[in-house]
């Protein structure tokens, strides 16, 4: 497929195009769902959250949207773990099996995935019917070797989509014994390397970053990531539990506006991004 342009119709930044000239992709995404298997209690003090979320609602929403668009993409940006007795008792098995039922296409690693150590992570990731991608954790020599990949390439209607993940500094967030042998690399350096591979070697039409770095802050966040990289077309975020009611745009190294979305926590919201891609 020839080189294509990425247009974000939700913000109406493109003009009218002939239908035959356009490929349309629908991306759904979650982050920091934190074992929210059941709805949030109606007694929750936050009226925006009370009585909302839960697996059944999320699965029903996704199923309905997939019936309208069978080629939609579904991603998770980390921290599906920790937050309910289900996780404490079954150590993530319930969450992964439910994600399998919902048909996720890829996910990245959040810090809470380490809460029961590497052996448990390997068990869960093998159980997942979707790839786990993380470009900035070196896992050679650990039980995660061969399970966690830096990126995955998906295809929808002839469009090649490269998807890679970025995860946070573990020191201070995770007990040392729970990530022994995992080597952290600067997410900016990892992103530059992998995004270039996806664009130039793999010839991907669209490059999506699943980030668990958090929205703002130094030295590593989605803001600093976009400002210091190129070849990334979309960043879907997590970790900071930030809810965006609209897509944010930040300029990359080439001065391009790169879209960023994040959907709070506990799967109260599922992110939706509609992408129109025009052939060159």
Across the structure, where does each feature detected by a protein language model lie?
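Sec-dependent N-terminal signal peptides
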Residues: 4-13
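Acidic, metal/ion-coordinating pockets
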Residues: 19-280
């Amino acid at each position: 497929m020839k080189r294509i342009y990425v247009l974000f119709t939700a913000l109406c930044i493109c003009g009218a195009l002939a239908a035959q000239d356009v490929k349309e992709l629908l991306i759904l995404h979650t982050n920091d769902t934190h074992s929210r298997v059941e709805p949030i209690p109606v007694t929750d003090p936050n009226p925006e959250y009370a009585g909302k979320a839960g697996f059944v609602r999320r699965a029903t929403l996704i199923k309905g949207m997939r019936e309208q668009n069978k080629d939609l993409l579904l991603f998770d940006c980390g921290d599906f773990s920790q937050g309910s007795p289900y996780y404490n008792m079954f150590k993530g098995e319930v969450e992964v099996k439910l994600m399998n039922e919902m048909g996720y296409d890829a996910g990245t690693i959040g810090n809470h995935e380490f809460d029961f150590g590497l052996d448990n992570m390997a068990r869960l990731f093998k159980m997942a019917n979707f790839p786990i991608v993380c470009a900035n954790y070196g896992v050679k020599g650990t039980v995660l070797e061969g399970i966690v990949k830096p990126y995955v390439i998906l295809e929808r209607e002839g469009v090649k989509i490269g998807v890679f993940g970025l995860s946070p500094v573990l020191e201070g967030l995770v007990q040392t014994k729970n990530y022994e042998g995992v080597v952290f690399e600067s997410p900016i350096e990892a992103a530059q390397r992998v995004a270039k591979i996806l664009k130039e070697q793999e010839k991907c039409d669209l490059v999506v970053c699943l980030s668990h770095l958090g929205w703002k802050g130094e030295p590593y966040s989605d803001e600093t990531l976009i400002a210091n990289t190129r070849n990334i077309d979309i960043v879907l975020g997590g970790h900071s539990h930030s809810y965006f009611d609209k897509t944010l745009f930040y300029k990359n190294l080439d001065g391009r506006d790169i879209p960023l979305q994040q959907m709070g926590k506990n799967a109260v919201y599922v992110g939706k991004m509609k992408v129109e891609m025009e052939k060159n």
